[in-house]
Amino acid sequence: PGVYREQINQNNTIVSQNEQSLSYTVCDLNTGDARGVYKNLNADLRQYKRIKMFVHAERYKNQPLADGEMVAFVRLGSDLSENFYQVELPLQVTPAGAYLADAIWPTQNRFDIPMDALTQIKAKGINSGNLANLTYYDAALNLISSPSITPHVAGQNRYAIKGNPSLADIQVIMVGVKNATSNQVCG
């Protein structure tokens, strides 16, 4: 929705960049459990102001799935366990039979990550001396003291940081979903 392929001029030729996508199904995801895919790379993200990504969620084989039961996340850092930023977004489920772009790709499912939010939560973590633990912040960058019982807000990012990640040295990115309910989910 509203995305156009980036064009790069090379040797008097205009080359269109490839559009990338990923589709996967997750079933029997237990409470608080997460699954994702990752890509190793070497990237310096300091030159970017925002990262945007469109996410779609749907029921799988008529199994029940309600809005907010699955949460999409993007984790980026020098590793996936000790030094990373994480951004989460609760997912709105696309109704069966939807064919309009805005129904398939609802606004609430669009990651729009301001890079300065990541630098601000890192500064807060340094000031509080709490970078060793996974620490969560809401969309207004206020500390969430009990993330497991604080509900996600539709259409709003939830940020997290652990360790000492650097936007200048991103070596791995993970994209996935986690179960935000007390039941198993599938989607």
Predicted regions and their residues:
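Extracellular/surface-associated beta-sandwich interaction domains
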Residues: 1-187
